[in-house]
Amino acid sequence: HTVTFVAAPMVHWPEAMVTFDTTDGVLFSADAFGTFGSLDGKLFADEVDFDRDWIDDARRYFCNIVGKYGPFVQHLLKKAASVPITTFCPLHGPVWRKDLKYYIDKHDKWSRYEPEEKGALIVYASMYGNTEKTAQTLATALCERGITKTAVYDVSDTDVSYLIAEAFKYSHIVLASPTYNLNIYPKMYDFLHHLKTLNFQKRTFGIIENGTWAIKSGSLMKEFIEEDLKECLVLSAQVSVNSSPNESN
């Protein structure tokens, strides 16, 4: 066998390299094309229902570990396109020997920060249940209008890695947060901070704020998105809830 070593900096370590077996076309891809999850007796991706059982973990792996370094992944994908690869052997997850284009296309989209699906991710924080009720009401209304690709998460009850992965998946994101000491609710701010550190971009945001007096969370979330997230649009129609949702808001 003849092998070639190719530098793949920041995918995801500075010194990362991949190894290409030119004899059989096997790419030992290190952290590239990896995923969370154990193999459970199946070695190859074509032996499992990857789209059903693995793609969510693959997305979560990429977005949280490599997501910040999209341009470096794009550079590696361009290198990979120039050689006849038959098989991916990543350090984490199953081996790919069929339908490589499917998996390459996923990584191409993730690394360009393009959404996979046109749909809505609703992330809410709620202290007394009122903001949660507002978020669920919105989700119901969206589904009634045919937007069935809608996911709703409590930011206080969901590990941020899952929220990041879902944010990379959907085209539209709604943030619903109460005002907390004239600021964004801490868990919601933490989610926004993670988006920033992972170079998240190219999404449309809607904002719902809640409070009894001196409501500030909406304007602060809008300011954060516009100043710290690239190429993101904040819809002008912002919803402001005074404690609990009603017909007027």
Feature names for model-found ranges:
Residues 1-47:
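Catalytic core of the metallo-beta-lactamase
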Residues 3, 26, 120-122, 205:
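Conserved hydrophobic helix-helix packing surfaces used for dimerization/oligomerization
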Residues 29, 91, 123-125, 208:
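Short hydrophobic segments within beta-strands
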Residues 39, 50-88, 93-95, 137-151, ...:
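FMN-binding flavodoxin-like domain, especially the glycine-rich phosphate-binding loop
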Residues 89-116, 190:
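Short N-terminal or domain-adjacent regulatory/targeting segments
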Residues 100-108, 134, 153-162, 184-191:
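A general structural motif
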Residues 118-164:
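Long, well-ordered mid-to-C-terminal structural blocks that present hydrophobic/aromatic surfaces
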